[in-house]
């Protein structure tokens, strides 16, 4: 097993927090959204909750394997302002844009970890490459939703 790189552990911890926060926000949004136009978005978000939790489990296990400590709820740092429930539960576009912002940030984080672990920690890199592919899939799906919603 490679010696734990503090930068990699810090970035993995950020990714772990982001995955959990995304799952929490997807859960809230999949319940709070209202309206006929919201149904497909709610279904997509509800389906992605388990994927995001699965990502957090993979990342958390890797943090532990590298000698780090997986954070508990009191030390998590959440900051997805754009994914917070809207006062208007029919504002589907705001939710879609929040998902896009969240997935874009996750993609940046995984790309950072992939670069930090390149040539040093192939297991971490492999986990992040696979997770990156999932996040890119989520981003593509919600970009497609946004295109449809922004048509006039």
Give residue spans per PLM region:
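Iron-associated oxidoreductase/ferritin-like identity signal
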Residues: 1-152
């Amino acid at each position: 097993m490679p010696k734990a790189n503090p930068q990699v552990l810090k970035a993995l911890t950020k990714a772990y927090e982001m995955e959990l926060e995304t799952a929490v926000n997807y859960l809230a949004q999949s319940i709070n959204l209202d309206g006929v136009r919201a149904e497909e978005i709610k279904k997509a978000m509800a389906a992605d909750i388990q994927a995001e939790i699965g990502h957090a489990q993979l990342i958390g296990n890797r943090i532990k394997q590298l000698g780090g400590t997986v954070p508990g709820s009191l030390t998590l740092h959440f900051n997805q302002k754009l994914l917070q429930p809207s006062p208007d539960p029919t504002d589907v576009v705001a939710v879609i844009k929040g998902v896009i912002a969240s997935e874009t940030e996750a993609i940046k984080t995984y790309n950072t970890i992939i670069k930090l672990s390149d040539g040093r920690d192939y297991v971490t890199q492999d986990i992040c490459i696979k997770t990156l592919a999932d996040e890119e899939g989520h981003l593509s799906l919600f970009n497609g939703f946004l295109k449809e919603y922004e048509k006039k």
